[in-house]
Curated annotation (Swiss-Prot):
InterPro entries noted in UniProt: AraC-bd, Homeodomain-like_sf, HTH-like, HTH_AraC, HTH_AraC-typ_CS, RmlC-like_jellyroll, Tscrpt_reg_AraC-type_HTH
GO MF annotation list: DNA-binding transcription factor activity; sequence-specific DNA binding
Name recorded for this polypeptide: Uncharacterized HTH-type transcriptional regulator YdeC
Entry keywords, A to Z: DNA-binding, Transcription, Transcription regulation
Record has Cell cycle as a keyword: no
SUPFAM superfamilies hit by this protein: Homeodomain-like, Regulatory protein AraC
Domain HTH araC/xylS-type: 191-289
Pfam families: AraC_binding (PF02311), HTH_18 (PF12833)
DNA-binding region in chain numbering: 208-229, 256-279
Organism: Bacillus subtilis (strain 168)
Length: 291
């Protein structure tokens, strides 16, 4: 069982190889995550995904994308996203996270990378394995994964060559970039509200509190959450508290009552009820299975 680590801002704490090689590449089986899915998060790195087995359902901002075996995604820097497997397909994929500054030389970054980082109409690109330009990118993802595993002589240089090839294919087959200030503001406000929840989830939280964090009215706040997460703000708070309880329940010395209060519930019975709804088992059953 793996724990997907994010900070209170929902920023993924990606582990890079070294400062000299700011690349993380690994295989992920979605249902082996502690939550059973990859929770909502974002990161500064750009991300390439290649589905090796099964079907993944990604949500990037408010859009949902189904990705099948042999296909993949490019996910841009800074965008909120999450993933779950579809229909018990035991989905496994390669995930490649790369610092944008490492894709091309610094001299080329401002012309060929930075415009893509700041565009507002490129949260992601679907990479269809039956299109040659996309296949070139996906093959390079596999090659980089092999290079990192094998660490043959000068493998770091080989990785930079593959990244250059990937980015050229993406740029040549991309589209007209757009820059919409209102979309930037929406994304920033959503992150502000989520960050506030993650800092205060152990406290009593009202809809007004969340809306205030995003400088929105209560109705606007609800529309943001409905559009981006397809749930109400307070339902998100509930789900986040359950998510935080999973790690605590795995500690051998923890007990259900203590955990319920540590994640913001003021009633153990209510915590048990909501946990069972979310996880299809009681907190105690989960603890026995995972501690």
């Amino acid at each position: 069982m793996k724990n997907f680590v994010i900070d209170q801002n929902l920023k993924e704490l990606t582990e890079h190889r070294t400062v000299e090689l700011p690349v993380a590449c690994y295989k992920t089986t979605i249902n082996q995550n502690i939550n059973g899915y990859i929770p909502l998060h974002w990161h500064d790195e750009i991300q390439f995904v290649l589905i090796l087995k099964g079907i993944a359902l990604f949500q990037i901002n408010e859009e949902k994308i189904e990705v099948h075996e042999g296909d993949g995604l490019f996910i841009n820097s800074g965008y909120l996203h999450m993933a779950e497997e579809k229909e018990g397909s035991d989905c496994t994929y390669i995930c490649l996270n790369v610092s944008p500054h490492f894709v091309l030389s610094q001299e080329l970054y401002s012309s060929y990378v930075q415009p893509y980082m700041f565009s507002t109409n490129l949260p992601y690109l679907f990479l269809a394995g039956n299109q040659q330009w996309a296949k070139n990118i996906l093959d390079a993802v596999k090659k980089i994964n092999q290079l990192i595993q094998q660490k043959t002589s000068l493998y770091e240089i080989d990785i930079t060559m593959q990244l250059t090839l990937m980015w050229k294919n993406l740029v040549v087959n991309g589209f007209q970039l757009e820059y919409d200030q209102s979309e930037m503001i929406k994304s920033h406000r959503m992150k502000q509200m989520l960050n506030w929840i993650h800092l205060h989830y152990v406290e009593k939280i009202t809809l007004e509190d969340i809306a205030k964090a995003g400088q929105l009215s209560r109705s606007e706040c609800c529309r943001y959450f409905k559009r981006m997460l397809n749930k109400t703000p307070l339902r998100y708070v509930m789900d986040y508290r359950i998510q935080k309880s999973l790690l605590l329940l795995q500690h051998p010395e923890s007990n259900v009552t203590e955990v319920s209060y540590q994640v913001g519930f003021n009633s153990t019975s209510y915590f048990i009820s909501k946990f069972q709804q979310a996880m299809n088992m009681t907190p105690l059953s989960y603890k026995k299975m995972n501690s």
